[in-house]
Amino acid sequence: MNKAFFLCLVVLCAAVVFAAEDLQKGKHAPFKRAAPCFCSGNPGRGDLWILRGPSPGGYGYTSNCYKWPNICCFPP
């Protein structure tokens, strides 16, 4: 019984270590809280930010169009 308990404990610890390592990789992935949108006069797909005034910084947006009360922001 002690050997089985020890083996389960080792497997549990290994699973926690590998899960934590996988979560560390996920932290560096970019994540936007925006929906896709389209505006006439702007090529391609933009990001629709709901109930927001200007385009948020840090995402590299170069142009936008307003769809009141939302904004559609376009990357370069």
UniProtKB/Swiss-Prot annotation:
GO molecular function annotations of the record: ion channel inhibitor activity; potassium channel regulator activity; toxin activity
Family annotation (Gene3D superfamilies): Anthopleurin-A (2.20.20.10)
Main localization of the protein described in the UniProt heading: secreted
Subcellular compartments: Secreted; Nematocyst
Propeptide: 20-31
Tissue: Experimental results show no expression in the ectodermal tissue from the distal and proximal tentacles, body wall, and oral disk. Since paralogs are expressed in this tissue, an expression of this toxin in this tissue is probable. The negative results could be explained by the very low abundance of EST sequences.
Role according to the record: Blocks Kv3 voltage-gated potassium channels. Reduces blood pressure.
Protein name: Kappa-actitoxin-Avd4n
Organism: Anemonia viridis
Lineage of source species: Eukaryota, Metazoa, Cnidaria, Anthozoa, Hexacorallia
